[in-house]
Amino acid sequence: MLTFSEQQFKTFKQIAQLKQSGLKKVLVSFLRKHYSQNRVFYSEHYIYAIGDIPIALVAHLDTVHKKIPSQIFWDREEDVVWSPQGLGADDRAGVYAIMQIIFSGLRPHIIFTTDEEIGGIGAILLSKRTNPFADLRYMIELDRRGFTDCVFYDCNNKDFEKYIESFGFETDWGTYSDICELSPSWKVAGVNLSIGYFNEHSFAEYLEPNILMNTIKKVKKMLKIPKKNIPVFKYIPYKSSKPGFIYDTDENYKKLALAYGYNFYDDEIGIICSGCHEAFFEDEVFPVKSVDGTTKYYCPDCVTDNIEWCIRCNEPFEKENSGDTNVLCKDCRKIKGASSK
């Protein structure tokens, strides 16, 4: 059965335990390491990276919870991840999935948005720009609860629906996600896929890693299709409304979503960044195992200069000095015959 390794669980926890603002800065740094710097673009409300695969992967960085989870547990017997403070797998599981796909060496187009849970602010602002991906064939959002759902919202492209179903998904209906803004604006079909979380928007939320990993496997299969064979799917709107299925495009949804009104910045400052030595909220700093075996914390601005991602285990590790060119963490370098080539 596909599930997390211990290292992958640790990576998911690190993603889940950052505030939106900190996660955005970490992801900008991460994308710049894996894509050319001149192909990574960001603003206050979104990040996008131009890849070499004409499919865009989409996830949002915020969660509905007022505070980030300080405790995250993985019941390995039942293969369930949960937190008494609210897990936030909607949509940190989507962020994790995209990072794992990038770790595998694939380079699709990437979109990360902010504030989806309070009205899709990041997606709305990005949708007002011209489509930045000249060769975009279709979009995949990784932000759906459940097992094998594929949700198309108000896109009525039946060929696209059949194509996505051919990878093992089943069509269902939904209310809203980022592609509800991006697809009609850019005239490109989009789908939202299940990534294994349940009871979203509540403290009873949980994640089944097996489902998440299976979705990652299916998406990678789509991305590995030769570029010349990847179909182009246009956004085709429904001609008439279907209550309960079509996304309500007026302002009512956004007004309701804004009722969440969570303040992400009401914690006490108390963690000192090991790089700049300034104080930060606990969920604004990135924990990493240092060269002496202890845990150090770096703010998002100091991540680039002090942290590298191991090419063997995909875990972050502290650079030993400013000129450190190691691409393997200390533990992986100890493995007999380990090579960074």
Walk through the language-model features, giving the residues of each.
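Zn-dependent metallopeptidase/amidohydrolase metal-coordination segment
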Residues: 55, 65, 170-215
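A non-catalytic alpha/beta surface segment that caps or lines the substrate-entry region
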Residues: 7-53
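Catalytic-core environment of secreted peptidases
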Residues: 48-89
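Zinc-coordinating Cys/His ligand positions in small cysteine/histidine-rich zinc-finger domains
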Residues: 281, 298-302, 318, 329
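Short cysteine-rich clusters marking metal-coordination/redox-active sites
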Residues: 273-276, 299, 310-313, 329
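Acidic/histidine-rich catalytic neighborhood of metal-dependent amide-processing enzymes
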Residues: 64, 85-164, 171-172
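His/Asp/Glu-rich mid-to-C-terminal helical/loop segments that flank catalytic regions of hydrolases
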Residues: 199-265
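Short functional micro-motifs and their immediate structural scaffolds
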Residues: 281, 285, 307, 318-322, ...
